[in-house]
Curated annotation (Swiss-Prot):
PANTHER family: DNA REPAIR PROTEIN RECO (PTHR33991:SF1). The lineage of its organism: Bacteria, Bacillati, Bacillota, Bacilli, Lactobacillales. Belongs to the RecO family. Keywords: DNA damage, DNA recombination, DNA repair. NCBIfam families: reco (TIGR00613). This is DNA repair protein RecO. It comes from Streptococcus agalactiae serotype V (strain ATCC BAA-611 / 2603 V/R). The gene is recO. HAMAP family: RecO. The keyword DNA damage applies. Involved in DNA repair and RecF pathway recombination. GO terms for biological process: DNA recombination; double-strand break repair.
Amino acid sequence: MRVSQTYGLVLYNRNYREDDKLVKIFTETEGKRMFFVKHASKSKFNAVLQPLTIAHFILKINDNGLSYIDDYKEVLAFQETNSDLFKLSYASYITSLADVAISDNVADAQLFIFLKKTLELIEDGLDYEILTNIFEVQLLERFGVALNFHDCVFCHRVGLPFDFSHKYSGLLCPNHYYKDERRNHLDPNMLYLINRFQSIQFDDLQTISVKPEMKLKIRQFLDMIYDEYVGIHLKSKKFIDDLSSWGSIMKSD
């Protein structure tokens, strides 16, 4: 085994035998790995075994089996997120999305930093729905989906009232609408935002203000994109879909 010091985000844990746990951690430098924690309830690591916990770990890495946690420091527990059902649900979804987007044991520091920053912004109170949309758009390439939301697939002009074409997997400008009789007839303003989401840097993001009607259009479009081009169905996604129906009751209370 080798020793590695790295930041890591706990994805989930599950019981193993009587009092042991298997803990999956997405680390910045070692990728996603499974860690064995013996006597978890009595372990000094118990405080950092919960999902959505980030810490600086000292790890014993086994490239051919289970790895082990040797020590930790600098714990970030996302208290605001964990105390809010809506924030927690969206945070859990993007974490699950990151989990399925890359293989185990493969380092992806860029994705780790992106996920960590997204969770921090949710914790800080920025719009968790739009942050999730940005995460979804920028994660598409991890699933091998390369869609251009910037210019027309035929003439490459920009800044026009575009529509999306599944036939051409991209945008059509008004001069080329005729190329696809089954184009989606989408709101061009929504596609403009999707294009912004594809390239936006979180360091440039200070505030988010998107009307509910536009949020719904974005949500429906990204659901369509993920269904057709990615094809994954996560329990955490179904839960936030259900929130849109009964969650409004809780918000009104």
